[in-house]
Structures are given as structure tokens and as C-alpha cells.
Amino acid sequence: MKKIIFFGAILAPFLVFSQQLNTRQLNRLTELHWQKGLDLLQEIVAVPNDAAIASDLGETERLMTKAFASRGFELERLETDGVPLLLATYEPKKRFSGSTLLLYFHADGQAVDPSRWFQNDPYEIVLKQRSESSDWETLDIDLLSSSYDPNWRLFGRSTSDAKGPIVMFLTAFDALVAQNKLTSNRIKVVIDLEE
């Protein structure tokens, strides 16, 4: 159920401007695309994004450019007094309605002290659950391909704050494109590399 709510929340902005999907259709889209979303999350989380390290920001910019460009977005680098912003624009393939959906994401993260993470690498997605002693125990992430427990959690640096929302958007976008349900509106995404 949480997968459906999560996926539905991400699809909501698209659905405001496009054809409505019922619960059965949302369930189907979730089943078809959640694994691709998890794979993308693992790929994106694996790239360090410490805002204080210039090379991390450059790598994050390249990663975001690739992720959006591969989906048909045109990217523009917006220079600022500091770190540039990226503006990703998707022009609808259908007849343009005249409206634009504008979204904002930040892709940077805070410094990380690996010794304070209870896993080998903070930039690796790890599946965990609470043990009887209330400690987090690591599970085989492949369990997600065959089962689901609402008490499981994914751990990885910037998973819930910076990178997770971007992956949710891209996964929802992919799902709607695959079903030919994408909005007839222009979509603009501001990606802040140093919030």
C-alpha cells in the first residue's frame, strides 16, 4: 500500500494536467516501474554529492544532465554568483496546452562521516529492518524483488532528501511516458546543485 501511495503522490502533479488514472492503473504502473526506480536510486545515490567538495558537484551536475537529457529534456546551465543551477525543459510531444509545470529539486548533500553510518558505504543503498533489540539489521536488498514489508527501510546518503525526490520524479515520468499518459504541458525542472 505504501508503494501505491508513494507512487501516486509523485504522479499527482502530472495527473492534474493529464488523463486521470484509477487505482488499478496506479497499481499496475507501480508494479511495472518500481524496480527501475530502485535501480535508478542505487545508481544516483552511489555518486557522492557533498556540496563542500567541488568535484562532487561537478559529478552531480553530469549525472543530473545525463538523467534528464536521456528522457528528452533540454538542459540549460544557469550561471549564478555561486554554483550554477540546471534548468531542464521538456516540451510535450502532444499538442501543447499552453501551461507549464515548474518543479524544483536540489541535488546536493551535506558532508558525511562514514564512521557514523552503520553500513560499509553511505553511498550504497542498503535495506534494513529493526531487530528485536531495536537495532537496524541489514537485509539482502534482493528481497525487494520478491516481497515487501512496510517496516523495511532503505538507507543511503541523500536518499530521502536530495536524491530520492529526483528519482521519484524521473520514475513517475518514465511510467507516464511508457503508458502514453504524459501531460500536454511543458515541464520545467530547476535543479539546484548547492541549496
PLM regions and their residue ranges:
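Carbohydrate-associated surface elements
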Residues: 169
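Acidic/His- and Gly-rich active-site-bordering loop/insert found
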Residues: 20-159, 166, 176-186
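Acidic, glycine-rich active-site loops and adjacent beta-strand->loop/helix elements
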Residues: 107-109, 190-195
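Bacterial Sec-dependent N-terminal signal peptides
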Residues: 1-20
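Residue-level micro-sites within transmembrane alpha helices that shape
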Residues: 2, 160-162
